[in-house]
A protein has these predicted regions:
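Membrane-topology segments of multi-pass transport proteins
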Residues: 2-172
Length: 173
């Protein structure tokens, strides 16, 4: 998969697309359920779609924000531990400088000065890529679980307008 898909903007685009898809899927689903059962839906079709879109988007977006806020400090701590293990004689004041060099090596901005820095640069790049894959998978899974939960709850008798308006009141007031 392209690296842009695992960026914050790429993942945000994916969960927005998931929310839009869940809107249309749920709106049509409740209308077909109502026609099949002969029961008039409690709310308009758009409210069922909005309910599903909220469940697909909000938990996934919150997880994306949490992941984004914790990834950099976690990766920095892991690479610092690897650096200290690889070069225990390194003075404490040089550690931030070496971490910056490792990041630049991983990004391809500079060439490694020795074998240890090359290994640490590759390790940092691998950890960063794995964290991006994990973030993408976790956010997508939460979005799909939200869609599944909303789909499970939606029926013509479900009062989606009331639930949607309650969500808006709690979120903004």
């Amino acid at each position: 998969m392209p690296a842009q898909l695992f960026s914050f903007g790429g993942i945000l685009f994916v969960i927005i697309a998931l929310a839009i898809g869940s809107y249309f899927f749920s709106s049509r689903r409740v209308i077909s359920q109502a026609q099949a059962s002969g029961i008039k839906p409690h709310s308009l079709g758009m409210y069922y779609g909005l309910y599903a879109a909220i469940w697909a988007f909000v938990p996934a977006a919150l997880l994306l924000i949490a992941f984004t806020g914790t990834t950099k400090p976690l990766l920095d701590g892991l690479i610092e531990q690897s650096l200290i293990q690889a070069a225990p004689e390194l003075p404490q004041s040089f550690i931030p400088l070496k971490i910056a060099q490792i990041k630049n090596i991983a990004n391809g901005f500079i060439e490694p000065t020795d074998e240890t820095m090359a290994m640490l640069g590759q390790e940092y790049k691998a950890m960063r890529d794995n964290m991006g894959n994990l973030r993408f998978a976790a956010v997508l899974m939460v979005g799909l679980l939200g869609l599944g939960f909303a789909t499970w709850r939606i029926s013509p008798q479900f009062k989606s307008r009331i639930v949607f308006e309650t969500f808006l009141r709690r979120a903004f007031f």
